[in-house]
């Protein structure tokens, strides 16, 4: 305790700021010096632990009120609320207004109403929508967005909308248009987006975009239109949504896409500058003319998707500078809902792809099943990848006994390798 007391106030504040606010308050019992130090903490985190009993929630309410009113930090860097069904819009509005007076920079609200109570969503106060100092806003679950026409977040750089409710069809578009310097957007349409079937993300300053469907809604028919020319990171995981990328994205570097899509060429066209690409993609059309991903050096493909053989060949032909190729199985349940697949056969490219001849140096296959077509792919890559340094294979343990897995993997040792320095790693 004496050693801690010798630390500077600034360092102590950094330490206690990482704790839940209820634990921070307890520190005032440690010494006279700490009695008022907790009031200067710039990060406040409140969690009612999904309290269902109104009387206990009343205590939590008073505790939050007191903690926020007594706080003396010049700037509240973070204010976070994780609340359950007893919390009301009025409670949240009061706390938000106090936070705005205290120059709040980041606001996070997660509200879970509970399945056994009447629907009680959280509505945000209108004054928040024109708060000029907010830099980060994260909203989750049953939070309603009723966005006014005059919405303006001139400082907002990060926005997370996870399973929120949109009051009108215009709410999301109006909100995004009021964020002129937004750099990061996370959008999860699960459960509560029934008013909105078409999402428009048209933000010239956006650098990072994640569009998710964590619930895996099969009744989909959602359309996402993205126009973000400054985008560098793009993550799209929605097997039943439709994605339209407008114009080229010359700055994009890292892309992860999981979707059932009819035309991969149309989907990936605006992403030609990508350097790292992860695909769980089920094309429903035959891929012919290849594209040119001149900067692509790292590719990950899901070997669990329908017609992935064609996609593999197409990507090898389209990626002349590819250095890393990883094949995996994502075990997505969504693949179970596809029509019965036709029997697939892998066909070798008409000519050896440039990436195999000159650049590929890492090849990895996770959950290798040692099927006939898989063996053809492995044999072809090992036979033609002249610069290959490592080839790593791990067997699908859920399908075969250990002895059989070892036997299948050991067969790879006898396959011809174009690279004399290639190291074969078997797991």
Curated annotation (Swiss-Prot):
<dbReference type="Pfam" id="PF24758">
    <property type="entry name" value="LRR_At5g56370"/>
</dbReference>
<dbReference type="InterPro" id="IPR001810">
    <property type="entry name" value="F-box_dom"/>
</dbReference>
<feature type="domain" description="FBD">
    <location>
        <begin position="345"/>
        <end position="395"/>
    </location>
</feature>
<dbReference type="InterPro" id="IPR036047">
    <property type="entry name" value="F-box-like_dom_sf"/>
</dbReference>
<dbReference type="InterPro" id="IPR032675">
    <property type="entry name" value="LRR_dom_sf"/>
</dbReference>
<protein>
    <recommendedName>
        <fullName>Putative FBD-associated F-box protein At3g50710</fullName>
    </recommendedName>
</protein>
<feature type="domain" description="F-box">
    <location>
        <begin position="1"/>
        <end position="53"/>
    </location>
</feature>
<dbReference type="InterPro" id="IPR053781">
    <property type="entry name" value="F-box_AtFBL13-like"/>
</dbReference>
<dbReference type="InterPro" id="IPR055411">
    <property type="entry name" value="LRR_FXL15/At3g58940/PEG3-like"/>
</dbReference>
<dbReference type="InterPro" id="IPR006566">
    <property type="entry name" value="FBD"/>
</dbReference>
<dbReference type="Pfam" id="PF00646">
    <property type="entry name" value="F-box"/>
</dbReference>
<dbReference type="Pfam" id="PF08387">
    <property type="entry name" value="FBD"/>
</dbReference>
<dbReference type="InterPro" id="IPR050232">
    <property type="entry name" value="FBL13/AtMIF1-like"/>
</dbReference>
